[in-house]
Design a protein with these regions (language model features):
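Nucleotide phosphate-binding/pyrophosphate-handling subdomain across enzymes
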Residues: 2-7, 17-27, 271-374
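Walker A (P-loop) phosphate-binding motif
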Residues: 99-141
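Residue-level signal for inorganic ion chemistry
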Residues: 24, 73, 114, 143, ...
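Beta-strand->loop->alpha-helix junctions that form or flank phosphate-binding loops
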Residues: 60-61, 97-101, 234-252, 305-307, ...
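Short internal beta-strands
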Residues: 31-37, 217-221, 353-354, 373-382
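Flexible active-site lid/hinge loop adjacent to a nucleotide/diphosphate
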Residues: 155-243, 251-253, 258, 269-276, ...
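N-terminal leader/targeting and accessory segments in enzymes
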Residues: 1-98, 102
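C-terminal helical cap/extension that packs against the catalytic core
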Residues: 45-51, 364-420
Length: 451
């Protein structure tokens, strides 16, 4: 679609919506911003744009004459596609894109795209480093803080875009076709948005929908859903595994990551040479290595990059050591499966801070994963009673309920002994007490440093 001269509704007035509006104006479209919250400060929204174009903001009610005059709708990732207003756009025959589709249509060059329930941020950052070390023009975008739309105009034919893509963003793609895609894993998450596990899986798998036979899809062999999915794909499928040797693909063999490509069997790296902790991180490394290798980056270059790479902020991030107690920030552990990875990476007795906003997750598997490592479970937020009940059902009773994160950190300091770890790995979203998981992690680090 030629965007110049088109009237486009941008649904959502947050960072993503503003980025989309600015980009649309730059390519000659006429953006209109809409927010479903009638209390939205419309002037404040206008001030958030780059100020180079006139824009009208609607809040609460969208006038029918505005809706009837539209050529295209761009949804922010936070807007569910099953809202009555969004459904009415589809019924009207309007194209409905997300920011990823918009950026893809405007930008040029090849795209390497990563999705999955957990590990996306680390894998994206790692692949970004590998590609930046190997290529001239590389953009790392997505949920990692840089909106795809903000860089789209800079993406030329020789550019490589490494994009972290969430399930929300995949709901609204149309022609988006990565040269190499990866689905790291699929576990229960965001059921408050996608309603069923089947729908969540369907949306995640959309990342491969427009890929051709020359393209590559990297999948986790240890994920049964993905192993089955890989049998029916158009692109070439490359598996990675942390649980077994593969005839083709990349796998963990003891302390070595091995790449098997046809007759070639190559040791990529020893795990002790990496600065990342835990089996889940070795899976992230394997996914990034496979994506870069099948995009033509040499193994020597890949090896150098992955050995230099350090952990992403808020993902089992070492904070400090005080009085023999090590503090880790895993605020990115926003669901039980991610938090399981956090506790599995601990190699000392642990005081675990959990709880937060309720995403309708179940906590049984997380509590089973404590595996004798957790000395105290210190709970905060909306879910604290629900998690306490689940823990007690599993026979775990060393539980302390706190009002907020500051109190939880103080309690951990009082209870911890030299040789222990204190781990913030909430298994829940941050909303309610914090704006986002980054703010929660930053506050944790500040409280720890002030002990």
């Amino acid at each position: 679609m030629e965007l110049q001269g088109k009237k486009v509704l941008v649904f959502g007035s947050g960072k993503s919506g503003i980025g989309a509006s600015d980009l649309l104006a730059k390519v000659g479209a006429f953006p209109v911003i809409y927010d479903g919250n009638a209390e939205t400060d419309k002037d404040a929204v206008v001030h958030k744009t780059d100020g180079t174009y006139p824009v009208t903001v609607y809040a609460g009610e969208l006038p029918k004459e505005v809706q009837d005059s539209l050529d295209l709708v761009v949804l922010s990732p936070g807007v569910p596609t099953d809202l009555p207003l969004v459904k009415s756009f589809y019924e009207q025959g309007l194209p409905v894109w997300g920011e990823v589709e918009l950026a893809y249509r405007v930008g040029d060059g090849e795209v390497l795209a990563i999705t999955g329930t957990n590990g996306k941020t680390t894998t994206t950052a790692l692949l970004g480093k590998i590609m930046q070390d190997a290529r001239e023009s590389v953009f790392v975008v997505g949920n990692i803080g840089i909106p795809y739309t903000s860089k789209a105009l800079e993406m030329k034919q020789n550019s490589v875009t490494v994009a972290e893509i969430s399930s929300f963003q995949l709901e609204t793609i149309d022609e988006f076709a990565p040269k190499v895609s990866a689905i790291l894993n699929i576990t229960e998450d965001h059921l408050n948005r996608h309603h069923t596990m089947e729908e969540y899986i369907r949306v995640k798998e959309l990342i491969t929908e427009n890929q051709g036979t020359e393209d590559v899809c990297v999948l986790n062999y240890e994920d049964e859903v993905l192993r089955e999915f890989g049998k029916h794909l158009t692109p070439r499928v490359v598996y990675f595994s942390s649980g077994r040797k593969l005839d083709e693909g990349i796998y963990l063999d003891g302390n070595k990551i091995i790449l098997k490509d046809g007759e070639k069997e190559i040791e990529v790296v020893k795990t002790e040479d990496l600065k990342l902790l835990g089996k889940h991180n070795f899976e992230n490394v394997m996914a990034a290595v496979a994506m870069a290798y099948y995009d033509g980056v040499s193994l020597d270059s890949i090896r150098k990059s992955i050995c230099e790479f350090t952990a992403v902020a808020h993902r089992i991030e070492y904070v400090t050591e005080k009085k023999g107690v090590v503090y880790y920030n895993d605020s990115k552990g926003t669901n039980p499966d991610a938090a399981i990875k956090g506790i599995q990476a601990m190699n000392r007795p642990t005081l675990l801070i959990g709880g937060g906003y309720d995403k309708q997750s179940g906590y049984d598997e997380w509590i089973e994963a404590f595996d004798g490592k957790v000395r105290y479970l210190v709970l905060i937020g909306q879910t604290k009673e629900k998690i306490k009940e689940a823990a007690e059902k599993h026979g775990f009773h060393d539980i302390i309920l706190c009002e907020d994160l500051k109190e939880a950190v103080k309690v951990c300091e009082e209870k911890a002994q030299p040789g222990d770890a204190v781990l913030l790995s909430p298994a829940c979203a941050s909303w309610g007490q914090f704006d986002n998981y980054e703010q929660r992690g930053d506050m944790f680090k500040e409280y720890v440093r002030n002990l």
